[in-house]
């Protein structure tokens, strides 16, 4: 993401929920477009984080002796 990269999956999810609530009310077209774009970026961020965790869990399933590293590779 360009502007405010979330610090965590939970932060991104919380922001997505906030954007969704805002967009359900009255919102000027330009603001709605900006919110949609930000939401799109947040969804991609969350999908990436979930895919990373899923890969790490597959390693555990394949061989329970491997260490689970939840630290970001970024």
Curated annotation (Swiss-Prot):
Gene Ontology CC terms, in alphabetical order: cytosol; exodeoxyribonuclease VII complex
Keyword Repeat (UniProt): no
GO BP terms in the entry: DNA catabolic process
Molecular function GO terms recorded: exodeoxyribonuclease VII activity
Main location: cytoplasm
Subcellular location: Cytoplasm
The EC number(s) this enzyme carries: 3.1.11.6
InterPro entries, per database record: Exonuc_VII_S, Exonuc_VII_ssu_sf
Swiss-Prot/TrEMBL keywords: Cytoplasm, Exonuclease, Hydrolase, Nuclease
Domain of life: Bacteria
Catalytic activity: Exonucleolytic cleavage in either 5'- to 3'- or 3'- to 5'-direction to yield nucleoside 5'-phosphates
SUBUNIT field: Heterooligomer composed of large and small subunits.
Protein family per UniProt: Belongs to the XseB family.
Function: Bidirectionally degrades single-stranded DNA into large acid-insoluble oligonucleotides, which are then degraded further into small acid-soluble oligonucleotides.
Protein name: Exodeoxyribonuclease 7 small subunit
């Amino acid at each position: 993401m360009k502007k405010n990269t979330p610090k965590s999956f939970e932060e991104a999810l919380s922001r997505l929920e906030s954007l969704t609530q805002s967009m359900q009310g009255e919102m000027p077209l330009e603001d709605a477009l900006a919110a949609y774009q930000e939401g799109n970026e947040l969804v991609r961020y969350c999908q990436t984080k979930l895919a990373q965790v899923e890969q790490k869990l597959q390693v555990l399933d394949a061989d329970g002796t491997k260490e689970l590293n939840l630290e970001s590779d970024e």
